[in-house]
């Protein structure tokens, strides 16, 4: 009798699960279309940018570099890739970072995967009427980068924010758009 009950339960579970197993994976086209539509809000970033950037270190020492950014869509416009380089006065690279910005339709939220100075992380990015804000948790503080884009100028300010204290600016760059770029989508390897 027990064996018959176990068999009956197995058959019922198999019958219930069969329709779900028969379905294939969901068609990604609608999801990708939502990602592509959301990423159009960042199309102002596309191209090549250059200008001064100043970082203020602890103790007030200022480091000035020539900052460049190149930015563009990838995966058919479903993600946005940004590379930043800071050049020292002697022309050497003093800073290099890579960011991949994506949109999650399930969460209706943007995020940026950032790689810089041997570190990596996923950070929330929020669009604003004039650009974007992205934040990095840093112990009791939050590092907040506020980007303003207007008339071919990319202005970004980095601040250290702690509860009960005014934000402390430690980074500022003002870049001008100097041209178009087919990076990163150009140069794909052909099939033969």
Segments (PLM) and residue ranges:
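Hydrophobic small-molecule pocket/channel-lining residues, especially in calycin-type beta-barrels
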Residues: 22-192
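Cleavable N-terminal signal peptides
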Residues: 9-10, 20
């Amino acid at each position: 009798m027990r064996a018959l009950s176990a068999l009956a339960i197995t058959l019922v579970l198999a019958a219930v699960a069969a329709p779900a197993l028969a379905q294939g994976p969901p068609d990604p086209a609608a999801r990708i279309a939502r990602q592509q539509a959301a990423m159009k809000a960042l199309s102002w970033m596309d191209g090549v940018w250059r200008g001064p950037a100043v970082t203020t270190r602890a103790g007030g020492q200022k480091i000035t570099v020539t900052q460049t950014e190149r930015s563009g869509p990838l995966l058919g416009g479903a993600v946005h890739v940004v590379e930043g380089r800071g050049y020292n006065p002697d022309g050497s690279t003093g800073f290099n970072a890579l960011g991949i910005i994506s949109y999650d339709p399930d969460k209706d939220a943007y995020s940026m995967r950032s790689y810089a100075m041997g570190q990596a992380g996923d950070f929330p990015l929020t669009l604003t009427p004039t650009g974007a804000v992205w934040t990095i948790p840093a112990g009791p503080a939050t590092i907040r980068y506020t980007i303003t884009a207007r008339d071919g100028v990319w202005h970004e300010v980095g601040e250290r924010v702690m509860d009960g204290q005014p934000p402390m600016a430690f980074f500022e760059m003002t870049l001008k758009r100097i041209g178009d770029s087919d990076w990163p989508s150009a140069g794909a390897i052909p099939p033969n």
